[in-house]
């Protein structure tokens, strides 16, 4: 029956998958906390207009929206940044700056599915508000490098491509593109590496760009060297100065080997204003692992006073595909330390007492609740990833002991229950 299948594009998480998810999230949290970030959360359900104000047409078309029982238009969050902006705006002036927060929310987008992309995913978000210098952007890059190192990835496997929305602004200014046309052009440019050149050119022309403008955009945004960018934009380019400062600071962090300038990185969302970046597998086999950048003028789109801000979103699906490709998925056993089993049904009450005493001491114990054969119990204990099997037998218990089998070595010993 179709109603017994999960909704297309969503995932069930069985215990082994939850262990892997917990492992991944623990490294998300550790990388952020090592850099002084605090965790926050927000509702999954928001007013639809929160996302249709300034996010860009593509994300608006991907919203899961509906009308609630009171006739309000609401949406499942497609990303976390608008919710974060709402939270910051609601306490404007009361929050000490800079704000360094992170979250791991579930996000929803109705989009085409492919490897590393579903219609729901968990997204690690790390943001800094109230710091306008490029130092904050480099701090975010350092958080990413800390995470990659923790999960066993190296600069040979992952690269951080960076540019600035100011590069795009200067290029488009030079060919006379401004206003609403700017946001539409950004979306096409964000797809340059994914679309055939002829199709991208056709989309530019649909937006009213002439051949000369298209050639200028494609040439400048195809650059991979900051010196070449300086030649194209001029030595007085604000964008070039900003990116050179970013590169210098990255050297101070010791993360420059992860970084590479890529003029085509613009990010598709309309609210970015400065440095932007994406993490990619060097193999080129996967879509972007994560992406982010500076969004200094977001709050004014909600009617508030702008506050400098920068951040990134990092989905859980692509990184797991990359870790599989690199052989870095860990083998994770369950959390059970001991399995307790009464060999005689009359000893079940005593087994409950032993298990309760161990749990009170903080040990993870699985108590076999039904009458089972010892062979089944051994298989069960190994399946749980338990360290020991605690057996209650009449003879040993009369002498004040239980039998304990070390499941790694197979060695058995007798131990007093209160010494477990």
Where do the PLM segments sit?
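Auxiliary tRNA-acceptor-end handling modules of aminoacyl-tRNA synthetases
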Residues: 1-18
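Polyanion/phosphate-binding surface patch
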Residues: 9, 40, 44-74, 117
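Positively charged, Gly/Ser-enriched RNA/tRNA-binding surfaces
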Residues: 17-35, 46-47, 70, 81-94, ...
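Glycine-rich, mobile lid/loop segments that gate access to catalytic sites or pores
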Residues: 162-170
């Amino acid at each position: 029956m179709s109603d017994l299948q999960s909704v297309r594009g969503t995932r069930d998480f069985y215990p082994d998958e939850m262990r892997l998810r917990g492992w991944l999230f623990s490294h998300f949290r550790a990388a952020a906390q090592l850099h002084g970030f605090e965790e926050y959360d927000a509702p999954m359900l928001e007013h639809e207009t929160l996302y249709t104000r300034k996010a860009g047409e593509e994300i608006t078309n991907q919203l899961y929206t509906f009308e609630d029982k009171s006739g309000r238009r609401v949406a499942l969050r497609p990303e976390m940044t608008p919710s974060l902006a709402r939270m910051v705006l609601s306490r404007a002036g009361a929050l000490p700056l800079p704000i360094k927060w992170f979250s791991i929310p579930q996000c929803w987008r109705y989009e085409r599915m492919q490897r590393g992309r579903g219609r729901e995913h968990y997204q690690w978000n790390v943001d800094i508000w109230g710091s306008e210098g490029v130092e904050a952007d480099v701090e975010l890059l350092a958080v990413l490098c800390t995470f990659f190192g923790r999960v066993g990835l190296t600069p040979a496997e992952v690269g951080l491509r960076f540019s600035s929305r100011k590069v795009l602004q200067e290029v488009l200014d030079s060919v006379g593109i401004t206003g609403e046309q700017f946001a539409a052009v950004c979306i096409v440019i964000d797809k340059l590496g994914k679309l055939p050149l002829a199709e991208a050119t056709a989309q530019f022309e649909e937006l009213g760009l002439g051949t000369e403008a298209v050639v200028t955009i494609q040439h400048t945004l195809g650059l991979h060297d900051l010196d070449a960018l300086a030649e194209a934009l001029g030595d007085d380019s604000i964008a070039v100065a900003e990116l050179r400062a970013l590169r210098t600071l990255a050297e101070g962090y010791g993360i420059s080997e992860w970084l590479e300038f890529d003029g085509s990185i613009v990010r598709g969302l309309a609210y970015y204003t400065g440095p932007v970046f994406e993490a990619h597998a060097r193999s080129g086999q996967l879509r972007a692992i994560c992406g982010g950048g500076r969004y200094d003028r977001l709050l004014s789109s909600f009617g508030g006073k702008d506050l400098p801000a920068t951040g990134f979103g990092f989905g859980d699906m692509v990184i797991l595909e990359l870790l599989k490709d690199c052989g870095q998925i860990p083998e994770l056993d369950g959390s059970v330390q001991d399995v307790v089993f009464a060999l005689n049904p009359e000893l079940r009450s005593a087994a409950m007492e032993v298990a309760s005493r161990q749990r009170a001491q903080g040990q993870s114990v699985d108590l076999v609740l039904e009458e089972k054969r010892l062979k089944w119990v051994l298989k069960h204990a190994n399946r749980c990833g338990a360290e020991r099997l605690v057996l209650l037998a009449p003879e040993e218990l009369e002498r004040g002991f239980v039998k304990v089998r070390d499941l790694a070595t197979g060695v058995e010993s007798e131990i007093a229950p209160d010494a477990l």
